[in-house]
Amino acid sequence: MMGGFPGFGGSQLGGGMPFGGGGVPGASSFLGGAPSGGGGGGAPASSTAGASGPAVDPGSIQGTGWGAALAKDAAANANGPGGYCYKWVGQALRRHGVNVSGASAYMGADQLAKNPKFREVKVNPQDLGKLPAGAVVVWNKGPGHPHGHISIALGNGKEASDKIRNQITNYGTSVRVFLPK
């Protein structure tokens, strides 16, 4: 296992491991751009399996002021080296009073599901780009994605984590969505 970047070990979110890539160059398909295929390597198609909450049409979701502030903060600070989505999203959440812990992005989903500042909803993965600002999207781990992925929707079809990119809609694993209350 690689040690990651200096200064990342020992913190709640650091752990010394790059999130989403495991330290292996090219292992993280979301570095440098969103995956566009079916996940490759026999990975399952993206789905809402494992998500709880009602199914919703993201076009009908009213955003919140708190969600807009969270998205603005995440976008302003999305300047990481790549591969550290959980660290950067965790820092943005922490600045807004929400703490998540663990070594991998997918671990944030169960914590957000229990947090009173969020409500979980089911959203068709192809519609994730329509989410309001501040929605947190958590992709599960799977083949080629040992840590999963987490991001904060910016409300314009883009997401922020350690980088700003088009909202990922096909990661090859199941997805859970959390809306700020």
Named regions from a protein language model:
Residues M2, Q62-G63, N140:
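Structured catalytic/translocation cores of nucleotide/phosphate-coupled proteins
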Residues A27-A109, A113:
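N-terminal capping segments
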Residues S101-Y171:
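...with weaker cross-activation on analogous glycine-rich loops/strands in unrelated enzymes
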Residues M1, G59, P132-A133:
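Intrinsically disordered, low-complexity regions enriched in Ser/Pro/Gly/Gln/His and often acidic
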Residues M1-P35:
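Membrane- and interface-active hydrophobic/amphipathic segments that mediate membrane binding, fusion
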Residues T169-K181:
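Short, low-complexity, Pro/Ser/Thr/Gly-rich segments in the mature regions of secreted, periplasmic
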Residues G3, S11, G15, S29, ...:
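Hydrophobic transmembrane signal anchors and adjacent membrane-proximal interface regions, especially
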Residues R94-R95, R119, R165, R176:
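Arginine residue identity/basic-tract feature
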